[in-house]
């Protein structure tokens, strides 16, 4: 072997060694089985590697940036190894969020020589989206227009975490096949039908309103996301009266300064809580609402001049129909909150006010206040005592009343009762004059007028004695009566 051949052999060996070293450091996936899981396609899903079992790679590995599209250039070789097209996105996507055993890798991109196990929940899984391979079909007789690969999944919508953490509110993202992004918002065109279709597809009820740019920018991040940002604008609405998602949106180029479509649906959660305070029952009082963990008075609003808001509030308190409502005078020391929607169920945000006109609500109480248990017990005890007294004292009182009535009935007046007649006396109808004389004690019991007073010498019947005295001088009329009726008649 001459010197020229030796030099060529040495150069070949050095080149092979250099290529091997560069390959091991720059493309560590060589020799490691990399696959994408979590979808029906081999070209999109969570990045997993075979290392004593399948491991899911964290999105913070190899110090990747948060820009999904910038990271895509680092995955060209991986997509080719998987038999897919060019890479589209590399980073954390919420499409697939069921990682297995997670590992965090350091060093050059796609190097698995310096990886450590990470506990579940400490890092977000890494996702990769590659272009689907084109299907090889026989050439048709006519030239077909160039089209994108057929989508592997039906088109769908997704909401970026909503306003103040509310469910069913936020920026709308549309995914159709391998293309995903937000929708261009045009303030001049606000089709309600499109909003209803979006909320219905998301199972969030009906469309309420659009979120402004300030409200969208102020959307807080969930705890599990470090830098949440919606995808770039890649779609725009093309038909406001569409019936399917594919008919509603068309592709568009990214425009700087454009606003993404953000909606609020009727089924947002949590809802505003309400109550009535300061009244005689839970169905009467001043309307208050709960914002976060504090209660505040609900101020009167021009958006709710009718009874609709207050009827809904009565229903929330499980009361009857609305009876009345009136606005109270504003007080400097009475702050509150304002709802700009017509009904409380539509209020996704509340505005603070320093001078609040409170509203006093009166609803029909389905359970009116009855007698207190103590009052009922007192009434029952009183009735029991009354019955006992009637049983014990009733017969005795009855006997006394009957006796008194009979004694009064036994007394009668005998004699003239004319104006010019002066003779009158009282006697018992059961006793005669003779019996009175013969048995004075018994007569005194029946008639207290039958005996003269013990301490007096006067007669008990002066008129009768006078008549008898005068009749003694007259001829005897052979009358069997105790006294002369003719003389008594003259008197």
UniProtKB/Swiss-Prot annotation:
Specify the SRCR domain's residue ranges. Answer: 34-131, 157-266, 274-364
Q: What is the lineage of its organism?
A: Eukaryota, Metazoa, Chordata, Craniata, Vertebrata
GO CC, alphabetical: cell surface; external side of plasma membrane; plasma membrane
UniProt KW GTP-binding keyword = no
Pfam families to which the protein is assigned, alphabetical:
SRCR
Entry keyword Cell cycle = no
Q: What topology in the membrane does the UniProt record assign?
A: Single-pass type I membrane protein
One GO term of the biological process aspect: T cell costimulation
Task: Tell me which UniProt keywords the record has, alphabetically.
Answer: Cell membrane, Disulfide bond, Glycoprotein, Membrane, Phosphoprotein, Receptor, Repeat, Signal, Transmembrane, Transmembrane helix
Q: How does it assemble?
A: Interacts with CD72/LYB-2. Interacts with PTPN6/SHP-1. Interacts with CBL. Interacts with CD5L.
What positions are modified (Phosphotyrosine)?
449
Question: What modifications does the entry list under PTM / processing?
Answer: Phosphorylated on serine, threonine and tyrosine residues following TCR stimulation. Phosphorylated by LCK on Tyr-449 and Tyr-483 upon TCR engagement.
What is the protein name given in its UniProt record?
A: T-cell surface glycoprotein CD5
Q: Which residues lie on this side of the membrane: Cytoplasmic?
A: 399-491
